[in-house]
């Protein structure tokens, strides 16, 4: 932290020195000319009245005019130089970079900038030790905030709470308070990791950590699930990309801009995240092959897929009780495809009967592959194969509101949620890097009312929350 702060301070000092020198010459940061002595003002043209009473006086005044013109040219050159210096410093602080990549990549960058324009481009030193949430100071304040949570922020909860006993109401209010305090801690933790994420009140604030995990997560949390079955991994391991392939990777990439991502879905209170992570990857692979975006059936996987991972005890897909995307893709390969969402709609619970034969086939895959932990290789796989199905530790997501999350204390091995990587980019100033912070764009399955319209951004190249521990790509060759 000290080294990051000193690096930040050094850049600021350089900037101040540059500005001071040029302001003394009569030039402001944005290139506007101020008074230099009393020769000229901002926006004024040099006006010289040449007296012609004598030849000597005329020569003297012409000489003064030439000097003033030279001074004006020097100041303009200084202004240009200062602008270049400012651009250099702004780049160091995370300002606008030079344009790179294709027109489409630049368009994606501009969309990302507009989408997250409310996020600060700089991380202030004070934000490293504070949270945007304030501690609740009294019982009365807690009651008011909880009432607002139930009645105003999430009015769909109002009827539910009208049926609760006073004892249950008090219990939920205490859980709300614990989540409030935890959100403050997590935002501070994100700052320590170099992130810009905001944590606040979400629809999950009246769920304990255990309830949240049971009802909204669903990736099988076995000790070996992060590396999948050893036999399966060897059989399906992706070949490492060449250096030439990696050099060609674009700076920004987003499958949403290319039309390969369906709208954000909502799994409800069912641990079916693994099915949404799976269908998202196959929807993308199918789009790359056919040019058509077809929403696929999560319900078919809930009802029909009971496959198990070899060599992993209790790693069998089990409806709302959890599953693994690799198991699901194995089922889809063996079954011959996956039905459309329309023909086999989602119900948020497992039915007793598999109705796969009754539905309309929406997409097929030829195989799947495990991507290694190298996040540059992950970016290559994303660009080549489409959106990636991954596992993640979702503890910090319960209170996530927006921004780039870089959880410092998030356990990388405790994967409990299946999500979908759809792109990557970079934004803002990172104290530890002195340049923009790279991030993954993740599609979640908790509806558009959560996070950034249903999406989550997390630091790239750091392995935060195990984002690189279980990565699967669908193949459609």
Language-model segments: which ranges?
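Catalytic-core signature of thiol
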Residues: 26-58, 62-64, 73-117, 121-477
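Short functional hotspots where side chains directly engage DNA or cofactors
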Residues: 66-68
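Cleavable N-terminal signal peptides of Sec/SRP-targeted secreted and luminal proteins
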Residues: 9-28
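N-terminal secretory signal peptides that target proteins for export/translocation
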Residues: 1-7
């Amino acid at each position: 932290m000290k080294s990051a702060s000193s690096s930040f301070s050094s850049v600021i000092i350089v900037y101040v020195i540059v500005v001071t020198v040029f302001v003394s010459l009569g030039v402001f940061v944005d290139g506007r000319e101020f008074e230099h002595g009393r020769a000229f003002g901002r926006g004024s043209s040099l006006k010289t009245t040449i007296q012609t009473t004598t030849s000597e006086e005329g020569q003297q005044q012409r000489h003064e005019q030439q000097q003033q013109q030279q001074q004006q040219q020097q100041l303009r050159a200084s202004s240009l130089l200062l602008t270049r210096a400012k651009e250099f410093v702004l780049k160091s602080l995370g300002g606008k970079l030079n344009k790179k990549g294709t027109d489409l990549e630049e368009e994606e960058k501009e969309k990302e900038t507009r989408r997250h324009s409310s996020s600060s481009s700089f991380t202030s030193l004070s934000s490293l030790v504070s949270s945007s949430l304030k501690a609740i100071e009294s019982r009365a304040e807690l009651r008011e905030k909880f009432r607002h949570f139930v009645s105003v922020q999430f009015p769909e909860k109002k009827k539910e709470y009208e049926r609760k006993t006073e004892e249950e109401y008090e219990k939920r209010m205490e859980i709300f308070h614990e989540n409030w305090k935890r959100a403050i801690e997590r935002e501070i933790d994100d700052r320590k990791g170099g992130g810009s994420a905001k944590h606040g009140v979400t629809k999950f604030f009246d769920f304990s950590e255990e309830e949240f995990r049971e009802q909204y997560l669903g990736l099988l949390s076995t000790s070996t699930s992060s590396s999948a079955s050893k036999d399966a991994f060897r059989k399906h391991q992706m070949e490492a990309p060449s250096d030439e392939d990696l050099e060609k990777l674009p700076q920004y990439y987003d499958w949403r801009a290319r039309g390969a991502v369906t709208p954000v879905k909502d799994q409800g209170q069912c641990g079916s995240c693994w099915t949404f992570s799976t269908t998202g990857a196959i929807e993308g692979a199918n789009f790359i092959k056919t040019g058509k975006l077809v929403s696929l059936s999560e319900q078919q996987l809930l009802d029909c897929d009971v496959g198990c991972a070899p060599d992993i005890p209790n790693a069998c897909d089990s409806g709302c009780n959890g599953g693994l995307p690799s198991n699901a893709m194995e089922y889809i390969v063996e079954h011959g495809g996956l039905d459309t969402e329309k023909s086999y709609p989602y119900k948020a619970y497992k039915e007793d009967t598999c109705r796969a034969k009754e539905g309309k086939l929406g997409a097929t895959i030829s195989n799947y592959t495990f991507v290694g932990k190298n996040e540059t290789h992950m970016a290559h796989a994303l660009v080549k194969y489409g959106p990636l199905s991954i596992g993640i530790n979702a503890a910090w997501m319960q209170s996530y509101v927006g921004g780039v999350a870089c959880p410092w204390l998030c356990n990388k091995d405790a994967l409990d949620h299946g999500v979908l990587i759809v792109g990557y980019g970079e934004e803002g100033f990172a104290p530890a890097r002195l340049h923009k912070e790279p991030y993954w764009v993740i599609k979640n399955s908790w509806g558009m009312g959560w996070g950034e319209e249903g999406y989550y951004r997390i630091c790239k190249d750091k392995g935060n929350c195990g984002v690189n521990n279980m990565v699967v790509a669908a193949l459609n060759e």
